[in-house]
UniProtKB/Swiss-Prot annotation:
Sorted UniProt keywords: Cytoplasm, Nucleus, S-adenosyl-L-methionine, Transferase, tRNA processing
Residues annotated as binding S-adenosyl-L-methionine: S228, K235, E275, I276, E302, N303
Name assigned to this protein: tRNA wybutosine-synthesizing protein 2
Organism of this sequence: Schizosaccharomyces pombe (strain 972 / ATCC 24843)
One example of a Gene Ontology biological process annotation: wybutosine biosynthetic process
InterPro entries reported in the protein's UniProt record: MeTrfase_TRM5/TYW2 (IPR030382), SAM-dependent_MTases_sf (IPR029063), TRM5-TYW2-like_MTfase (IPR056743), tRNA_wybutosine_synth_prot_2 (IPR026274)
Superkingdom, taxonomy of origin: Eukaryota
Catalytic activity of the protein: 4-demethylwyosine(37) in tRNA(Phe) + S-adenosyl-L-methionine = 4-demethyl-7-[(3S)-3-amino-3-carboxypropyl]wyosine(37) in tRNA(Phe) + S-methyl-5'-thioadenosine + H(+)
Length: 418
């Protein structure tokens, strides 16, 4: 299900648009205020959310009209939303349990349940401000007893049909490995946190979750790797790129395969990936095989001899600073290069230009966090920079993925050679 996050000033307009198409979910209704802030504070800044409302719709990504898909004033959020009735039933069960523990009457205002969340089977991932009232804080401080907390979260787990529950917190900006260092497990066995390079046994013992987006299976170990559901629209856009079929692609920040898999599904001959987090590489490997795509992992210092058609995905477990040397030895170049690193991918720009195919209609997709007032100006600067580095004429198309914080957006600049 797709929900529209829009400015309050445009709420009536977009609600009418959705209602006229019989896509508005009346049983859920428009969401705003503290509930909206509580649910999405791990994706957007609170000050930004206070100016917005969320309009729930019955749209799927596949049937979104192009005018909505391309509208820069809408932030599209993909999720499963529970019905209000389910929330009420769960709330009653939780209040009854807390009341029995405290031996007193309690209220929903004191002990609200997380009403919106994301499920990645078998994990329920809650927003940062879940259980944020002073009463909840005092309850967890006073009843640190494992049995009491387990009894409480048993109720949630049964209601949501999950075996694990955790609170999601933002990825530290300076962590280049993009690890969920602040993930807070609440319920279920997440395994022992491993420092250093993991072994095959460590991979086998770890807790893994999964989901499907655009028909593509993805998996990851939530203690060690992140998953960004906010990129689903950009992943869908990649599926429709021109000049992918039977081409060589480079993904210099592969992660668990966010964009890699879209290129493969779109018909790329081989996608060459770089990733420094071994847990992300293992996640990418597992999901590729589940999707039926051949994959080969190359560690730093190992040789790789490229043969056309051998593997759909080749992952180098090393820094992308070695990408130019690898491509030179293989005597190949890339038609599309994905630079999916935030807040900026600038450190890899030079590498990208060195491995790009020197023909018309070659592309570098540059991901950046940009202040809203600077988006167009920065587009010209990025295009000029790449044109100089490539010594070729280029054009730049600007694509807004989502709001990153107030007045800052995740932008993808498509640089194309002409």
């Amino acid at each position: 299900m797709i929900s529209f996050l829009v400015q309050k000033s445009e709420a009536k307009y977009w609600k009418d648009v959705v209602q006229n198409k019989n896509k508005f979910l009346k049983n859920i209704g428009i969401i705003s205020g503290p509930k909206l802030v509580d649910t999405y504070s791990n994706q957007f800044e609170a000050d930004f959310l206070k100016k917005c409302v969320l309009i729930p719709t019955s749209y799927n990504k596949e049937d979104l009209p192009k005018d909505i898909l391309d509208c820069p004033r809408i932030y599209l959020i993909e999720e499963e939303v529970k019905s209000v009735q389910t929330d009420e039933k769960l709330q009653i069960k939780v209040l009854r349990y807390v009341s029995q523990i405290l031996h007193t009457t309690v209220s929903e205002e004191q002990y609200p349940v997380p009403s919106r969340f994301v499920i990645y089977p078998p994990l329920a991932l809650l927003s940062l401000n879940s259980f944020g009232t002073k009463e909840w804080h005092l309850f967890f401080q006073s009843y640190a007893n494992v049995d009491v907390k387990a009894g409480l979260f048993d109720i949630f787990a049964r209601e949501w049909n999950v075996s694990h529950i955790a609170i999601n917190e933002p990825i530290p900006v300076g962590d280049v490995m993009r690890r969920p260092l602040s993930l807070k497990p609440l319920y279920g066995d997440f395994g022992v946190l491993i420092d250093g390079n993991p072994s095959e046994q460590d991979f086998q013992k770890a807790f893994w979750v999964s989901c499907r987006q655009n028909g593509i299976y993805q998996t990851w170990a939530p203690l060690y790797t992140m998953f960004s559901r906010g990129n689903s629209i950009e992943k869908a856009r990649v599926l429709n790129f021109s000049y992918i079929k039977d081409e060589i692609i480079a993904d210099l920040y592969a992660g668990i395969g966010y964009f890699t898999f879209s290129y493969v599904k779109a018909g790329a001959s081989t996608v060459f990936c770089w990733e420094i987090n071994p847990w992300s590489v293992e996640a990418l490997r597992r999901a590729a095989l589940k999707n039926g795509w051949s994959i080969y992992v190359v560690r730093n210092g190992e040789n790789y001899e490229f043969k056309v058609g051998t593997h759909r995905i080749v992952v180098f477990l090393e820094s992308n600073v070695y990408a130019a040397e690898r491509f030179s030895k293989m005597n190949i170049s890339a038609r599309h290069i994905n630079l999916g690193m935030l807040p900026s991918s600038e450190k890899s720009w030079s590498t990208a230009t060195s491995i790009l195919k020197r023909e018309s209609h070659s592309f570098i997709h540059v991901h950046e966090n940009v202040k809203d007032e600077d988006i167009e100006t920065y587009s010209s600067e990025v295009n000029s920079c790449f044109s100089k580095m490539l010594a070729k004429n280029t054009v730049c198309v600007t694509n807004c993925v989502k709001s990153f914080s107030p007045r800052v957006s995740h932008i993808v600049y498509d640089i194309e050679t002409v």
